[in-house]
Every structure is written in C-alpha cells, then in structure tokens.
C-alpha cells in the first residue's frame, strides 16, 4: 500500500498546521513491514528438506542424485515462499509480531531525531502494515505529562481509516488529534523552531 504525492502533501500540511499550535514535533512513519527476521523460515525449510530423503527412500526408488537435487529445490522454494512478508509474519505468534513492530517503532523514534530533539518534546505516529500495528510514541517530556492512554483516540482513528484503505486520511486524523493534545500541554514558544522535517517516511 503506497501513498501518492498528493497524500504526502496533505500529510505534510497537516503536520505543519498541528505544529503551528504547539512547541512539540510530530513525525510520521509508514512501514510496509517491521519484521526482517529470516530465522524461522530457514528453520522450517531446512527441516522439510532434511526430512524429504527419508520419505522418498520409503516410497520411491529415486536415485541419490535426483533426491539431492529435489532436496535443494524444495529448500529454496520453501525459503522463498516463507520469506514473503505476509507469510513470514503469519508464522509468528501475535505477541511476537507486536513485540517486533514495537521494537522497530522505537528504532524509528531514535533514527528520525525524536530522541535527540530539544527536551524530547516530540511524538512518533507509527504504522506497520504487514503486522497490522499502530502506535504513538512520545518523547520523555511529553510522556511525563501526557499518559499513553491519551493517545488511544488518535490510534483508533488511524486504525479505522487504515483498515478501510484510507491510510493518508488515518494519519491526518491522528495528526489533528495529537496536535490538539500537544497544544494543551506544550503551547508554542516565543521561538517556535521547526527542528524536524514535516513529512511522512514510507519505508
């Protein structure tokens, strides 16, 4: 699921409008997937490939050469299929999927400059499509004043729109709600510097 140039522009304008009312920063990230782990697919493909000769020996008179060739083909084919993001994620328990997505969101929080901006007064609006995961992560200064539960309305709006295929609308709704919450606790300062780019990162 991708965003058009118009979607990017709309989201950028929403961030600018929200940040005009607060000294806080808003960063948005849309990830196609948070899981890049291949250990489980490799393990499953290897087990099936290793078990294959035993089955072939029991039920066929295949030569060793053909057996080895088929073993390699099965391993490679299974590995390719199991490494497809939807398949790979489907193999994981829900708790593991959420933990991986959360860890990736925290990495994005740090890499997009939110962990180092002034007073950590910024939030990350994060969605991982394959894992069906959405979360808002706040910097230390914001988290000290605004409980995580306060962001749930924005997360719910984000999920509702995204589930119906309107990803950009979901981000815009979340940005507006987050901007209102930030404005209550972090009004604009005399020098309201825009430290971070007003954009959505699609990765």
Regions found by a protein language model. Give the residues of each.
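Short, charged cytosolic
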Residues: 1-26
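Residue-level signature of catalytic and energy-coupling elements of molecular machines
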Residues: 23, 125, 174
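Select subsegments of transmembrane alpha-helices in polytopic membrane proteins
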Residues: 37-46
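Transmembrane alpha-helices and immediately adjacent membrane-cytoplasm interface residues
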Residues: 57-91
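Membrane-cytosol interface motif
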Residues: 94-112
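Acidic, Ser/Thr-rich low-complexity segments on the non-lumenal side of membrane proteins
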Residues: 106-138
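A membrane-cytosol interface segment of integral membrane proteins
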Residues: 140-197
């Amino acid at each position: 699921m991708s965003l058009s140039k118009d979607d990017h522009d709309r989201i950028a304008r929403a961030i600018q409008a929200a940040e005009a009312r607060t000294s806080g920063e808003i960063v948005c990230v849309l990830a196609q997937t948070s899981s890049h782990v291949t250990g489980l697919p490799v393990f499953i493909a290897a087990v099936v490939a290793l078990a294959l000769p035993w089955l072939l020996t029991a039920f066929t008179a295949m030569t060793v050469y053909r057996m080895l060739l088929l073993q390699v083909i099965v391993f490679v084919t299974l590995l390719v299929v199991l490494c497809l993001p939807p398949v790979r994620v489907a193999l994981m328990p829900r708790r593991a999927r959420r933990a991986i997505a959360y860890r990736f969101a925290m990495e994005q929080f740090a890499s997009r400059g939110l962990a180092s901006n002034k007073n950590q007064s910024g939030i990350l609006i994060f969605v991982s499509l394959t894992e069906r995961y959405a979360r808002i992560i706040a910097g230390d200064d914001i988290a000290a004043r605004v409980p995580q539960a306060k962001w749930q309305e924005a997360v719910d709006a984000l999920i509702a729109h995204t589930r119906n295929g309107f990803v950009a609308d979901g981000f815009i709704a979340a940005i507006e709600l987050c901007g209102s919450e930030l404005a209550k606790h972090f009004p604009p300062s005399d020098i309201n510097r825009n430290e971070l780019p007003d954009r959505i990162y699609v990765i």
